[in-house]
């Protein structure tokens, strides 16, 4: 691991919530998608196809509002601990752009920043691309002849006890909506399925270092296993599947897809599914469109009952976890992890956490948020 700064908690001037971004009105949709796909030669027709998903919801991605809710919760947790650390919000692809947020932080006198990237996972898209955002942000400040920021990015949190406990809680609540009171006694017609964003197989193979194996999918399987263990779900009564693949179909992505999986389960006699979007901390467009719209429509056609578990980013426990990740990165708290798969991503000033970790590969884009 590359060296990290030896800060104390009093050295942290601010926390930055760094995210993907999303449109907040019909007029934002195409400009946002153009930002997401800049330099990739994506035809306008394809952007219009994706835009339909946003326009169905008034051109609004739920992501920005949910991130603001996370920020409000972080501020409350900090206040409850007597900490007066400001929390800022910056996006890669839409307002508030992280470069603009960086300028504001500098004007406010901020120098040392703890950066929380809104992804639990390793891989290029889930981790290293946020390092690149930090590098570009400081280059922007240099071009503006402003002081650069010292940025400590927090680690991946897929196996943090508070994340696993909160995921377990929402899965249990979703099961109760189907009348299931004991997840350790699921019947043959009942299953729990955990979903995460599909990525190209080559991107999965290049997540982490070579010796880590495919880090992204290993982390997703580990997190699902930890939740299942917490709830007493037997290995035969839960699965991990993927969703929201994009591209032209010529490049293999992680499978099975949630829609194909639901059809197969129906054919095997399963009529009730508890669906837990463990790969998403908030109700991204992938969740509200792909699960609440497409999957529910399919389930209705098949006569299946689907109960979708809530995402956990809006909870007080999630905000507490973020503050604990800050404390952990400074040595104030011990490293808290329940699993054995590596949890990486803690880095300084955009340098990768390890040499040759999560190297980028050319891949189709996902334009949703």
Curated annotation (Swiss-Prot):
Record pathway: Porphyrin-containing compound metabolism; protoheme biosynthesis
Catalytic activity: Fe-coproporphyrin III + 2 H(+) = coproporphyrin III + Fe(2+)
EC main group: lyase
Keywords noted in UniProt: Cytoplasm, Heme biosynthesis, Iron, Lyase, Metal-binding, Porphyrin biosynthesis
Cellular location(s): Cytoplasm
UniProt keyword Iron, yes or no: yes
Gene Ontology terms: biological process: heme biosynthetic process
Name of the featured protein: Coproporphyrin III ferrochelatase
Organism of this sequence: Corynebacterium diphtheriae (strain ATCC 700971 / NCTC 13129 / Biotype gravis)
